Amino acid sequence: MSLASRGLVRVIRAYQRELSPRKPSPTCRFIPTCSQYAVEAIERHGALKGGWLATWRIMRCNPLVPGGVDPVPERFPQGRKTHP
């Protein structure tokens, strides 16, 4: 894992350890949670591609999207799509 990837994962882990438990109730509508998804995406696809997948996932974590099970893709989506 690159230095950038390790740094991002550390920041996310700090969020999970320090900030997330202080929230009044769980708010992520997906499984795995958005922060865990981000860690998995960065570990699997690197800082840039994994960061993009995590950003897209966080943008979808809102009341207009039903949520549910949404694992990190094994391969980064290819082609002309603007999002995964």
From Swiss-Prot:
Q: How does it sit in the membrane?
A: Peripheral membrane protein
Entry keyword Zinc-finger: no
**What is this organism's lineage?**
Bacteria, Thermotogati, Deinococcota, Deinococci, Deinococcales
Q: GO cellular-component terms in the record? A: plasma membrane
Q: Which UniProt keywords apply?
A: Cell membrane, Membrane
What task does this protein carry out?
Could be involved in insertion of integral membrane proteins into the membrane.
Q: Does the keyword Cell membrane apply?
A: yes
* Name by which UniProt lists this protein: Putative membrane protein insertion efficiency factor
SMART domains the record matches: Haemolytic (SM01234)
Q: Which Pfam family is one of those matched by this entry?
A: YidD
